[in-house]
């Protein structure tokens, strides 16, 4: 199978040939930061365009068509517009926390993004506690949201921030329990190790019914963590104007907007990594010719195809389901998803021991 690890190995050997160790490390850090930021921005623009087209499809429209062929540059035009907008200074806000909140949200998203293994050797960090790292770092974003609501000194932003905090903290529990079933099945917390163990079968297949239940719960809880419909109560326009980022404008609003789309990608990428084999191809036992053909497809392409299928499911849910009330949203977590997740961990233990 074709992997991209030879590219990173070649760059490392090339730098070691001409630079001392300290400079090699510095240059590699700069290159990694540059690539992450470029990939972050490009993925956000792509996801915005994809959502507009998917939304148009479900509403029997065409979507963006004017800027560039098939409207592909509409997201770029919108990005330029938002960068040129004025940063409006609001009276009676906590200036330090008001500005800090935007950076906390975006940094939490970038740190999580950097830990995702896109291909063999194509990840920034590969901790031996990778699953715990993802859960902990991705949870930092809620601090930025709470600060944004509080610092704005606005009743709508405070209500939106409190809703978002309650929602994220609640659904984080189901997310974590779902991922623990994969850890039990794989026997490892390291993301690259979990992916490589799926070379003989994806976890969603190897884990049977408990893995399927965990996958479904993770998709629901992960979608709720992104604050997107039908779980978009923190940004309910009819009640809270724009929720916790009502008072933000220009690039500061763009940071929240950017983080929302990248969080959607991160949730789908984690689902792909832990449940759908990551960069591993689809293999069917006994179908040797089919398996050989699948091996010719580049591994990074497998990763992105699976990830974008999960993203399409999230967009499908968003544009077809009505918004939940706050009591329905919390009842779904505490009375349905949480008990099922706890029972599912016991089921996975029995599956591992007896099957």
Swiss-Prot record:
Its main location: membrane. It catalyses: a quinone + NADH + 5 H(+)(in) = a quinol + NAD(+) + 4 H(+)(out). The keyword Transferase does not apply. GO terms for biological process: aerobic respiration. Its EC number is 7.1.1.-. It is a multi-pass membrane protein. It holds the Pfam family NADHdh. HAMAP family: NDH1_NuoH. Belongs to the complex I subunit 1 family. NCBIfam families: PRK06076.1-2. This is NADH-quinone oxidoreductase subunit H.
């Amino acid at each position: 199978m074709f992997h991209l690890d030879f590219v990173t190995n070649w760059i490392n050997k090339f730098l070691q040939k001409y630079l001392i160790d300290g400079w090699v490390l510095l240059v590699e850090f700069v290159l990694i930061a540059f690539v992450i930021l470029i990939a972050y921005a490009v993925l956000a623009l792509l996801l915005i365009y994809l959502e507009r087209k998917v939304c148009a499809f479900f509403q029997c429209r065409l979507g963006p068509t004017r800027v560039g062929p098939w409207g592909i540059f509409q997201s770029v035009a919108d990005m330029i517009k938002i960068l040129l907008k004025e940063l409006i200074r609001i009276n009676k806000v906590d200036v330090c926390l008001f500005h800090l909140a935007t950076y906390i949200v975006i940094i939490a998203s970038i740190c999580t993004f950097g830990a995702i293994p896109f291909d063999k050797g194509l990840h920034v960090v590969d901790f031996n506690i990778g699953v715990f790292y993802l859960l902990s770092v991705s949870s930092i974003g809620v601090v930025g949201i709470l600060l944004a609501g509080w610092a704005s000194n606005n009743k709508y932003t405070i209500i939106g921030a409190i809703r978002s905090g309650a929602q994220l903290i609640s659904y984080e529990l189901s997310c974590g329990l779902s991922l623990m079933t994969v850890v039990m099945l794989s026997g490892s917390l390291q993301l690259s190790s979990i992916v490589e163990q799926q070379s003989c079968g994806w976890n969603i297949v190897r884990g049977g019914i408990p893995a399927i239940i965990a996958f479904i719960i993770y998709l629901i809880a992960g979608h709720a963590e992104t604050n997107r419909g039908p779980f978009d109560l923190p940004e309910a326009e009819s009640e809270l104007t724009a929720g916790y980022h009502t008072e933000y404008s220009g690039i500061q609003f763009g940071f929240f907007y950017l983080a929302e789309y990248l969080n959607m990608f991160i949730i789908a990428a984690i689902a792909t990594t832990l449940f759908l084999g990551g960069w591993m191809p689809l293999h069917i036992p006994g179908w040797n010719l089919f398996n050989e053909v699948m091996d010719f497809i580049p591994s990074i392409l497998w990763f992105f195809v699976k990830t974008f299928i999960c993203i399409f499911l999230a967009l499908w849910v968003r544009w077809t389901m009505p918004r939940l009330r706050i009591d329905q949203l919390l009842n779904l977590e505490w009375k349905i998803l949480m008990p099922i997740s706890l029972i599912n961990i016991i089921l996975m233990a029995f599956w591992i021991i007896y099957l």
